[in-house]
Amino acid sequence: MAEETFEYPLDEERAQKAYDVLVKYLALSARSEQECKNKLYDKGYHKNEVEYALERAKKYKYIDDAEYVRTFLLFNKNRYGAKKIAYKLVNEKGVDKKLVDNILLDNLDDDYQIESATKMAQKYIKQKKIVDKSGAQKVGAHLYQKGFDWRIINKVMTNLFDVFEED
């Protein structure tokens, strides 16, 4: 016997309450569409009520995943590399991978990532009091944990640890 999904008729009052809950949730902080959807389902709203609330919020531009990604990137590009930012947006926030990749490609060039990774590495070296090449592996691992690509890490390591050799 094939399983059929029961489609609830749209209850205008519940749909309005779902929208009100969503607006309050969005008032606290910007959220991705998936986070909003999960919140409404967790509150017990049905699919059509959730869709109504989401569409209405999109209409008023309360939910815009592209703008959310740009804002997230603005606040996190100095803390993480592109890979970690993409991971957080796609896996934790539920944003479409293609959208994330396109915006990251447009906004994070290699030069910026190298500069950012260099600053992070210098800060880490200073905090851990690394004075020679023996600590290079720890610095590389730290940058990798922060989400930088190996290509970027290798360039930064070459620049930083060539300086150590000259001293």
Describe these PLM feature segments.
Residues 1-167:
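An alpha-helical, amphipathic repeat domain used for nucleic-acid recognition
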